[in-house]
Design a protein with these regions (language model features):
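Bacterial N-terminal signal peptides
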Residues: 3-12
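Predominantly soluble domains enriched in secretory-pathway, periplasmic, or organellar proteins
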Residues: 12-312
């Protein structure tokens, strides 16, 4: 029976066979690489400095990891599974995002109320952009023209023109926004508001909040798939699901303890969730809205950012 169940699980994960998860483990100071086809860890990469944020480039060549305690960003050659660079950024690097073309890497400096801009080829900081207090999550629009920064202690989101590196607008949202996610069209953004236990919906073009969705306790980040939003509720050990069109709740899914990072696979069929206190990565079927697998990773997984990599 177990063998049959395993075969069924692997078959259901077939659509994710060309992806891997790069999970930052803050307490074990490393990065776990999980093969989504086999649901098994395939590599552990030492990082140091209490790694938290992670962003994999669109071409899958590099994974960029923030280490708040080291005040640095580590550059990982994703296919080779090895560290190939380290960029000192100062302050408290947390959230991170890569431009769609891979040329620039954006890093939220929690302490300096700024976003550092790294030239990916030169591996050095080339600019700094002032934003609100305690910037956390970052996201870039699919066309690469705009960068959004969730500024936790200002209860706002900064919208930045990536060409001029100037502020385009500031959007007031719920209390203490942390993770921010932009949809595939680049039209709407979603912030997980830790203080008000809700998600703000932002119209990117007009730079205004157009909706609010109540979720569970201490929402951390948001993923989007199949017309639904998926939100990690840290204090509840659940993922809240809501309809993107109606903004109405759909379901709450129990995952591991203290879920944090969350992302959808490229085909939108699976949702991956990093569970901080369980030291696991949960796999959710985005259509059936149920957990279909769990993988042990390192100690204190956060996976804050775009942590999935397409391998083909």
């Amino acid at each position: 029976v177990r063998a049959i169940a395993l075969v069924a699980l692997l078959a259901s994960l077939g659509a994710a066979r060309a992806e891997e998860a790069f999970v930052t483990n803050q307490l074990s100071d490393d990065l776990t690489v999980v093969d989504l086809a086999t649901s098994k860890p395939v590599a552990t990469i030492a990082i140091g400095g209490k790694p938290a944020g992670v962003a994999v480039s669109n071409d899958g060549r590099f994974a960029y990891v923030t280490s708040p305690d080291a005040k640095a960003v580590t550059v990982v050659d994703a296919p080779a599974r090895k560290v190939v660079g380290r960029v000192d950024v100062g302050g408290g690097p947390l959230g991170i995002a890569v431009a769609p073309d891979g040329a620039m890497v954006y890093v939220a400096d929690w302490y300096a109320a700024a976003v550092r801009v790294i030239d990916a080829r030169e591996q050095r900081v080339v600019a700094s952009i002032a934003v609100g207090a305690s910037p956390s999550g970052l996201a870039v629009t699919p066309d690469g023209l705009l960068l959004l920064s969730a500024d936790r202690d200002d209860d706002s989101v900064s919208i930045i023109d990536t060409a001029s590196r100037e502020l385009r607008g500031i959007v007031k949202v719920g209390s203490r926004p942390f993770g921010v996610t932009i949809d595939a069209d680049g039209k709407r953004a979603y912030t997980a508001n830790v203080g008000t236990n809700d998600v703000s919906v932002i119209d990117v073009a007009t730079a205004r909040e157009i909706g609010r969705v109540h979720v569970g306790l201490r929402p951390y980040a948001v993923a989007l798939a199949q017309g639904r939003g998926f939100v990690t509720d840290q204090y509840d050990g659940k993922v809240s699901v809501f309809d993107l069109a109606t903004l109405q709740p759909v379901k709450r899914i129990t995952v591991g303890d203290y879920p944090e990072g969350i992302e959808a696979t490229a085909d939108g069929k699976r949702i991956l969730v990093a569970n901080w206190e369980s030291n696991t990565l949960s796999m959710i079927d985005a259509a059936e809205l149920k957990v279909i697998g769990e993988v042990k990773v390192g100690d204190g997984p956060r996976a804050f950012g775009a942590f999935l990599r397409r391998t083909e």
